[in-house]
Amino acid sequence: MAKRKTLPKDFEQLVQTASDEDIKKVLGKCDINAYGGYNKGNALEFPLSEEMMRWLIEQGIDINYVDQYGYTPLLYHAGRMSSEKQAIALVKLGADITATQGLDRETVMHVAVKTGNLELVKCLIQAGADAEVTSRSGETPLERTFHWARTFDLIKLAPVAEYLIGIGVPVTDKIRTYMRSAAEDIEFRRKDMSPDIMPELDRAMESLYGLLGVASVPRRVEYDGTSPIVIHEKRWQKQHGELWNLLVPGSGHAGTVQGEVIRISGKLAYEILDNGCCNWDSDFKSMANALYRYICMGTPLDADEQREFAGLINGIKNADETDINRLTELSVKWVTLNLNPMAVGELDYKR
């Protein structure tokens, strides 16, 4: 009787409740590399015991079987904190520690560092993995991880970074730049974060500041919503950044018209220039129309600039970089003419 090429649909639930002997009986009815689950990986991609994995390897299972998304069992488990034991077992059992996945060809070490699997990282080093191996984009595991690190990622990254740097992995300018960017984002959004997690996050950040030689990002000065707006920068590009940090909240709408002018001009620029309008909808159009209404309030731009602004808003979806820069410049100029805060009324947009 031919053996089935797919694992039972309830195999994942089975391995969490059944004994190894019962699992062997089920697998005995399947091809040794029968696949299943969302990724269509073989049995080694499931949370089996080390003894069960060893038995499967003795039966001839492919320890480096590639699932439909390009993951080997080791790569799959390396990307999950809950699967650290399985990943370590696979390394000990001879899985390919140089396997790569994804368009950027991230190695097992890249995945383990990014996931914060410290014990797996140590195991990989002991097995001879290169801690400075580069992805297709030319980034080492630490560089790649800091590149994409945000908020709570720093908590799990701190001990991994300390270990790798302790064994000689260099701290590059890329790492310092990425850390600075992540820290700035945290400080910008600090007010909106859960206070329960902040002590642990702050400890991780202080550790990384010292470890990487990065100057601490100062706490954000919150605008009170009533005082006259003070601008220190001279060029409009710098002024926009200064006003963004002062007036725009970490999430949601600004509390002043001036803040909404800066926020909307920035969101429009990002959606058009960075996203290619892929998220464009009626709400973006409503925001653009609101932006024009706002700059007609208080002390307006001169007549020629207002007409120019109206033209930019009318053709906003097809705007190029020059158009967006001009829209942003005029938005900043309007704020400089209206330094006394105006409260935002009812909004007809949600973004």
List PLM regions with ranges:
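Ankyrin-repeat intra-repeat helix-capping/turn positions
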Residues: 18, 48-51, 81-82, 116, ...
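N-terminal segments that cap or nucleate solenoid repeat domains
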Residues: 2-47, 51-56, 61
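A mid-sequence interfacial segment
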Residues: 87-89, 94, 99-111
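Internal alpha-helical scaffold/solenoid segments in large eukaryotic proteins
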Residues: 103-139
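Ankyrin-repeat boundary/"N-cap" motif
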Residues: 4-12, 34-46, 66-79, 100-108, ...
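Ankyrin repeat domain, specifically the short helix-to-loop turn at the C-terminus of the second helix
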Residues: 24-31, 54-63, 88-97, 122-130, ...
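Ankyrin repeat (ANK) tandem arrays and their immediately adjacent linkers/low-complexity segments
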Residues: 102-107, 133-351
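Coil-to-helix interface segments in alpha-helical RNA-associated scaffolds
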Residues: 49, 82-85, 119, 152-158
